[in-house]
Amino acid sequence: MSKVRINDLARELEVKSKAILDALADCGVTEKKTHSSSLEADEAVRVRAHFARGSRGAGQGGSRQQNEPKPKIDWSRVSKPGDVLKAIQERNEQETVAAARPAAVPVAPKAPVSAPPAARPSAPRPAVTAAPPPVAARPAGVQPGSQPAVSVQHGAEAQKPAPRRIVPQPRQPSAVVAPPPAATPAIAARPPAAPVAVKPPVTTAPIAQQEKPAAPAAQEVKSALATGPSVPVAVSPSVVVAAAPPPATAFQAPAAPAAPAASQSAPQEAKTPAAEAPPVAPEKPAVPAPPQRRVIMPQTGPRPVYTAPPPSASPVTPRPSGGGIQRGKPIFDRRPTGNSPGGPGGPGGGYGQRPSGPGGRRPMHPTRNQPGGGPPGGRPGFNNGPRPGFGQRPGGFGQRPGMGAPGLVPPPGDTPGRPQRPGAGQKRGGRSNQYPKSKEGPMKGFAPPSRFGGAQIPTEPLPITRTITVTEGISVKDLAEKLGVRGKDLIATLLMRGVFVTVNQSLDGELVKDVARQFGADTTVISFEDQMANEAFENLLSQENPDELELSRPPVVTVMGHVDHGKTSLLDAIRETDVAGGEAGGITQHIGAYKVRINKEDSPAFGREIVFLDTPGHEAFTRMRARGAKVTDIVVIVVAADDGVMPQTLEAVDHAKAANVPIIVAVNKIDKPEAQPDRVKKQLGDRGLVPEDWGGSTVFVDVSAKKRQNLDLLLEMICLVADLGNLKATPGRSAVGTVIEAKLDRGRGAVASVLVQNGTLRAQDSFIVGNTFGKIRAMFDDRGRAIEEAGPSTPVEILGLENMPDAGDTFLVVADRDKAKGIAQYRQMKEREVQLAKSSRVSLEGLAEQIKQAGMKELPLILKGDVTGSVEVLADSLQKMSTEKVRIKVIHSGVGAITESDVLLASASNAIIIGFNVKPDRKSADLAEQENVEIRLHTIIYELQEEITKAMLGLLDPVFKESYLGRAEVLNVFKIPKIGTIAGCRVLDGVLRRDSEIRLMRGGEQVFKGKLTSLKRFKDDAKEVTNGMECGVGLNTSDIQVGDTVEAFTMERVAAELTAQ
């Protein structure tokens, strides 16, 4: 026996597989089954019967409001919405006429009426005869929900009365009486039929129900007018009379065995030929239609199922009719029969049994002219014209499985104007374009993902509505968090731009700006150093306590100026003033900052302190400003009165203005006879620094460092400008400062000079500075004395660093060492990301630059210095010396003596070690001699630059220049055995030399290039032949012709140049 899978049976019964598994025990199946198990044929029959009983029981009892079906509309008879309104108006007019007529005399019916069979064959319904009019009310004892549908047959005559149907409508309170039906119309080939005559209505007698079998879920009724579409009418549950004439070729499916007469009359009526009379339009009565109750069109109902009349020879047992969808019942069994509601040709009906012999037309799409198979013919029960009504119900159905022949299924998009109800993207019958089958088991509800993973990718740039701040080398994940989008959306956007990245990959600044603009955000890219400075200041602000006392602090002054303008002399003079005031003199300054105390009693600034920074010029000041650390409070610009304003002076002024720092101009060397202080004031006034005595706001002080003139006035003016700035600090908070200089001491390790800007720094404090951390083991002031704490504006030298910090890094005291270590590790990771971002992505421009640099010479260097400031300045200045032909590459730079590791690195990379104010130890020098590593030691930067320039020139290839000598014309060609071809020439200009190179030209093209093998004047060898003389020239070629030109030249080596010409 054939088996049926539980999944297939569940789809057939339109239930879940779990429901079938739960019902197996009730059906006598004790073996354990799963969703993919199979059932025997007899077991499947029992399961179908079980669900059929359950659906009928649910339809009659229980939740009546939920399971009771709604009345249906025969969509096959509605072509447009106007037909519905027309049918309603005609129906109302007919009802009005019927209500005005007198009651007709009841007559006996002409033919027995077959009632629809019950679900079980053992309990058939008896045949019911229809009583003649007038209209009779329904007995109160009969419930509408259990009243069966009854159809009336009167014969096959052309003028037979229309059948009567009892329409159950349980939820309508008012009673409606239908007008008398029209006679059976004659049917033409295609157009719909029209009524010919009208007969009095027929009243159906109440039916005595002997047994109450399990009826279908609901009885749905549709009335089909001969002149229009079928319209549902609100009726009363007690008195309802509906009239609907069947078509001329009406037929009836065979009734139950209890009514054999009715089953035999159906095929006879089906064979009645259609009359050839043209369709007649019905007359519309002049009686106005009274207002009727609003008609509600239901949107649910079964799919229309078409059938053909069964052959008369072998009647088929009819199946129970049912217009509504019965859940749990197989979808293939919904083929109502009989000329009753739900039967073929009737209102709301579908297909009957398909005929076994040749007959009616096979089902076809409404837009097709001919079906795919079967001979053309009239389809019983349907018009051959265009299908009236509303067309397909919203969300329509696909082709019925197993129905039709090849060519019956319309192609996709062939049916115009088929609306879809929400959520009905799937068609029945397996005809669907997108995932027609519902999956069971673990793959239930699965649908393939959309393109780009469902990413919402903006196709056009959004308007700029916000601003974000990112660091260099930000990862894709961090950028997505700042933009508020998903990481895969950002990756998809980059993919559309041709950039392939992962979620952890770093991005460069320009790409970040472009992508953020696509998502409606303006981007500010800051460096890693700026981020660390911002974090430090945020921590500073977060730790501020309004209850803490703010005190005035000493100003921090930076002295800047052009070379040889007396900057160093002025600082020495100020220091001498401090020493003359009683301080110990001759103190060697180990750090670049020191304090000066004003001890002149008659001075207004007596007892005040000023901190001077001895920084390496404007270069270090620019770096501090770029890192966001405003170390300097006041800038003193030193200008020589005899020399005037120089370019470096203007550059220092620009840096001070960019840092928004007050400027004091010290006009030095006023003791010289050629001094012109007014010229200096005019030059600086043109740059925006207008003196106070000229109506400006810039303080000008005329000083002489050599004679120590007006130095006290300069210090007093510095204190006055500081008071205007209201410089305050909070000594009670944790210390915050800036690294001025850092160096590596052999005995003490890493040493940093720090200027405390706020708070108080104490010994044993844990701190974070840049990307390193540490704990203060010892602290010294500017005079080398060990101290325990340092207040605001105090320069100190600290020990206890784990690594070397950079000049300008922010110094911040934290709670404990572990926290400082975590912050340092995080900053080191971010710094690595920045470096990777600069080197990982290779664009087309970068690739072209690499190809261009492939032919460049490279000079690798290892740079070691005494302090970090010197190393930074040297590294920048040396790299700026790179040209298009030679590029300087600093492999490693550091602070301290030259070590063995430096020598090994230089040996591996063929680099030169440059030592600035440092020397190698004995082991390092021996290793360098063994490895043939060159070490160059310097103390002056200018000498270092000159030596590097010579090394760069030595790397260039030798350059040769062609020098023209003379030209001769070939007059004759001689071929001498054992010697070769000799050209007899006359020198046209210049000279031909025996050691020169020649070029043989013919017609402006070079034929041969080489050296002269011989040069003779007649029979004698000659060293050279001058202009106008004839000679014999021997060449290492035989391709010589009369009229060729011999050009003589030499190649000279010239000095190479670093820049391209």
UniProtKB/Swiss-Prot annotation:
Keywords: Cytoplasm, GTP-binding, Initiation factor, Nucleotide-binding, Protein biosynthesis. GTP binds at residues 561-568, 614-618, 668-671. CDD domains: IF2_eIF5B (cd01887), IF2_mtIF2_II (cd03702), mtIF2_IVc (cd03692). Residues 704-706 are annotated as: G5. GO terms for cellular component: cytosol. Residues 552-728 form the tr-type G domain. It is found in: Cytoplasm. Residues 586-590 are annotated as: G2. Residues 614-617 are annotated as: G3. Residues 279-291 have a biased composition (Pro residues). PROSITE patterns: G_TR_2, IF2. Residues 340-360, 392-405 have a biased composition (Gly residues). Pfam families: EF-G_D2, GTP_EFTU, GTP_EFTU_D2, IF-2, IF2_N. Residues 67-77 have a biased composition (Basic and acidic residues). Residues 51-199, 250-460 are annotated as: Disordered. Residues 561-568 are annotated as: G1. Residues 97-113, 120-130, 167-177, 184-199, 250-278, 381-391 have a biased composition (Low complexity). It comes from the Bacteria. InterPro entries: EF-G-like_DII, EFTu-like_2, IF2_II, IF2_N, P-loop_NTPase, Small_GTP-bd, T_Tr_GTP-bd_dom, TF_IF2_bacterial-like. Residues 668-671 are annotated as: G4. GO terms for molecular function: GTP binding; GTPase activity; translation initiation factor activity. NCBIfam families: IF-2, small_GTP. One of the essential components for the initiation of protein synthesis. Protects formylmethionyl-tRNA from spontaneous hydrolysis and promotes its binding to the 30S ribosomal subunits. Also involved in the hydrolysis of GTP during the formation of the 70S ribosomal complex. Belongs to the TRAFAC class translation factor GTPase superfamily. Classic translation factor GTPase family. IF-2 subfamily. This is Translation initiation factor IF-2. It comes from Acidobacterium capsulatum (strain ATCC 51196 / DSM 11244 / BCRC 80197 / JCM 7670 / NBRC 15755 / NCIMB 13165 / 161).
